[in-house]
Amino acid sequence: MKKTILLLVLSFFCTALFSQTNKAKKATSSSVFAKSDNVSAEMVKNKFYLFITNKGAKKDTILLKSFEVDKLPLECKIEPFMTKGIILHKITWQEKKTLQSKLKTEAALTTVSIICELASKTKVLSNEQTTTKITEIHFLDDKQTVSETIDRIRNEGFECIVNKQGEVVLKNKAKENKMVYVTADKKFVFVSAGPSKKKK
């Protein structure tokens, strides 16, 4: 009887230890959201990294963003491109956020773009563009017995586009700005607009 109890205790102890080990492994494991050649975008716990796998299996990392618990990047892409003889990588993903009350709902979709130079492990440009769909209930009388639903869209920020020349174009419905890469400073700068033409 004593031997049986001892075996049960040992079995329970081993099971608990195995379970804890598995949990620890899961907590430190990463999830891959996008990959391009030796570059991958991965989530470790709540931190979103760009991993660069070098020869000899050594990995470099660039921290892209820290997320709130239970939040994840969506539709992630990695796009390498050449500018001024240097290869840069554009990482793009989406984030969703919803604010809701009894009379109003705001569903926001944010597109985040970060451009990195891998050699120096530098983020050379960050951009966010948000489109928010707003749904509101408006009452047409004081007693709030008759109502109508109004939908509208709010756009904020600029779309981030990389053209064939390796230049960044930030555009929305109202304006368009071009940026070029300055290798010495490791950053994109706006192209100065020339003087406006005078009417004759």
Each model region followed by its residue ranges:
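Exposed acidic/polar residues on beta-strands and adjacent loops within beta-sheet cores, strongest
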Residues: 20-200
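Bacterial Sec-dependent N-terminal signal peptides
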Residues: 1-26
